Every structure is written in C-alpha cells, then in structure tokens.
Amino acid sequence: MPCADMAAVGLDSMQRANSTLEDFCRSYFMFHGMDVNKPQSVFKFLPVLAFTESYIYQMDTLNEKIVHMSTSNDMVMENSDRELPEGEERWFGKVVDVLKSDPFNPLVRQLETCGLMTERIRKELKFGEEYWTLERKLCSALLNQKQILIEDVMRAIHLKSFDYRVLNLLLYEMTGEKVNDLHMEFLSISEFLVEVSDDLFDYEDDVIENNFNILRMFVRTYGASEAPAMLAKCIAEAEEKYAKQLELLDSDLSFKYQKRCEEATKEGNPSIVSSVSQNLGGKVSGHSLGSWTIPPVIADEELYRRNLKKSSTRVLF
C-alpha cells in the first residue's frame, strides 16, 4: 500500500501529459545534443520525464477543478459565503488543502530519492505553485468583476511554462551537463510566445470555462478597444528579444530549432499558429512561429456565456 506522501500518478494524467512530452522531446532534446529519432535517447530518460510531467498534470487538474467549480457555482475560492452541499463542500475543501499544503512535496521526495533534485528544480516547482495561486486569483477576479493588476498577469504568463523548465533541468541533471543559461533564456522567451499563441487559439473556450488567458486579462485591464494593440505591443517586444537570442545560438542549433517550429506549424499545432500583423502597422512577424492573429475580443464575458447557454438550450429543444 502506498504511503500518504508517496508520489503517484493516474493513467488519465499520463495520457494528458503525452502531447507535452512529445513536444518537449522534439523541441528540447536538440539543446542537449540528442537525436529524438534515436529510441535509446528517448527511452533512457522517458521514465523520469513522463512521471514528473504526469504528476504536474495531476496537480494542474486539481487546480482546474477549483477554478471551474468557482465558475459553475459563481463563487470565489478564498472568500465565499455561499454554502455548498455537504459532500461537495468536503471534496472541495480536500482539493484546496492539497494545493495549499506543498503539493509538490511527494514529487520532491521522489526526485531526492533518485538523486535528481536541485535547488533550481525546487525553485521552478515553487513557481508552479505561484502560477496556480495567481490563476485562481485572476480568474476569480474576472468572474466577480474585480480589479486585476497587469503585473500579476505578466507574472502568471511567464510562470505558466514552469513544467517545461522542470523537465529541461531534470534532463541536465540526468545527463550530467552543466545548465546552459543562454539556452534557458532563449527557451524562456520562446515559451512565453508559445503560451500567448495558445491563449489566442483557445480564447473563446477559456472565456466559457473561466481559464487563465492573457487576452482575457488584457481586455479587463485595458478595455476591449485597447487590449489588442497592447497585447500586440507585448508580443512585438518579445519577438525582438527572441530574434536577438536566436542570433546567439550555435548556427546548427538555430537551424534545427527553426525547422522544428516549421514542422509544428505544418502539423497544425495551435501553439505555432497566430498573428497580430494588423495591430503592428502591417508588420509581418519575424518570429519563427509565424504571423499572429488576435481574435475578436469579448467585451462582456457574462453576456457571452449566457447567450451561449441559451443557444445550446434551444438546440436541445
């Protein structure tokens, strides 16, 4: 029988983590001089990478349940006077307790046992906890028409890819390499752009489900008319940093990474398809992820969700 503090993952979490693991192997192994097309390169490190990502997905699912429960019950996680049914309240309380009481402790213990835990990995896991806290705070604020700070929004979007950084740091530890800070810096900028791209692709769904989404946050902060231009400015600044960092990479590595981005685009990966050229004065994006398109913003999210619910009800009848 497993101990209470033993890290364990479910099959569903492993299945959900699959696409992230594939993307990580295809996009990050090259930074370690490894060929993802050679099975021995993948399977040597896959158990630790798969277990870690699956555990993170498992915790992320619990956090999503809290956010979605807040949406469906029109309640705020931290400060709600509304009463839930007794059984539901107990379950909700347990989920909150798990996320508030060092959710990564079992994983940390497991990695320590394997001799893989470093202070840098521990720090990234703490960033993951911080992201989930910010996600709950910001989504609750949107739902309850409360003010949000743009500093919190930008902090959250930069923390969001913490799992990729954890996996990358684990790979450094397993291969015995010294962490390459130049590569980490380049990848952090690329991760930011991919997260923004994902948010633009998932915008309408994130409004419906009350998920963290940078465009939603910009609409609340700057208003529906100004949000697209402000986000376009943010993307342009990140693209400029990306281009400068790309020039610092080894030419062969730079070529391989850009080729990987092109492959992902052809495969229809939503992370690699976006565009804000109309908001950049007609400028074509220089980022290898392609050009950008910001979807029409939803000024009144509550009305949007209500109308969608009415439409689905009419379809049923």
Question: What do these predicted ranges mean?
Answer:
Residues 169, 173, 192-195, 201, ...:
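Hydrophobic alpha-helix feature that most strongly marks membrane-spanning transmembrane helices
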Residues 211-237, 256-266:
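C-terminal, helix-dominated tail/subdomain
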